[in-house]
């Protein structure tokens, strides 16, 4: 897991973000992007019980809404009424 996948990560631009707990800058990928001991999985479609059959690009199916539809694993789901953490 990476900082980018943490609930405490605040995206700033295409290269870096901010940890809401430590207030420190963290890179999206590469050196220093590994998750810390305070890691909590972010509410993303890929972390939901209703997300299934992702392909190699992270495109899968959401089965939690009235009508099944495609969804990206990295899509934010904090406001989704059907989100259920795995």
From Swiss-Prot:
UniProt cofactor(s): [4Fe-4S] cluster
Gene symbol of the encoding locus: csdC
Lineage, broadest ranks: Bacteria, Bacillati, Bacillota, Clostridia, Eubacteriales
UniProt catalytic activity: 4-hydroxyphenylacetate + H(+) = 4-methylphenol + CO2; 3,4-dihydroxyphenylacetate + H(+) = 4-methylcatechol + CO2
Cofactor note: Binds 2 [4Fe-4S] clusters per subunit.
Sequence positions that bind [4Fe-4S] cluster 1: 3, 6, 19, 36
Key words, A-Z: 4Fe-4S, Iron, Iron-sulfur, Lyase, Metal-binding
NCBIfam families reported in the protein's UniProt record: glycyl_HPDL_Sma
GO molecular function: 4 iron, 4 sulfur cluster binding; 4-hydroxyphenylacetate decarboxylase activity; metal ion binding
InterPro entries tied to this protein: 4HPAD_g_N, HPA_decarboxylase_ss_sf, HpdC_C
UniProt: [4Fe-4S] cluster 2 binding residues: 45, 48, 62, 80
EC category: lyase
EC number(s) per entry: 4.1.1.83
Name of the protein in question: 4-hydroxyphenylacetate decarboxylase small subunit
Task performed by this protein: Component of the HPA decarboxylase that decarboxylates phenylacetates with a hydroxyl group in the p-position. Active toward 4-hydroxyphenylacetate and 3,4-dihydroxyphenylacetate, forming 4-methylphenol and 4-methylcatechol, respectively. Is likely involved in the catabolism of aromatic amino acids such as tyrosine fermentation. 4-methylphenol (p-cresol) formation provides metabolic toxicity, which allows an active suppression of other microbes and may provide growth advantages for the producers in highly competitive environments.
Family membership noted in the UniProt record: Belongs to the HPA decarboxylase small subunit family.
SUBUNIT field: Heterooctamer consisting of 4 large (HpdB) subunits and 4 small (HpdC) subunits, arranged as a tetramer of heterodimers.
């Amino acid at each position: 897991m990476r900082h980018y996948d943490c609930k405490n990560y605040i995206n700033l631009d295409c290269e870096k973000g901010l940890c809401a707990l430590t207030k420190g800058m963290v890179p999206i990928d590469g050196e220093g992007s590994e998750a810390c001991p305070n890691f909590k999985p972010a509410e993303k479609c890929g972390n939901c019980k209703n997300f299934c059959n992702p392909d190699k690009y992270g495109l899968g199916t959401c089965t939690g809404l009235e009508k099944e539809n495609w969804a990206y694993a990295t899509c934010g789901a904090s406001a989704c009424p059907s989100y259920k953490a795995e």
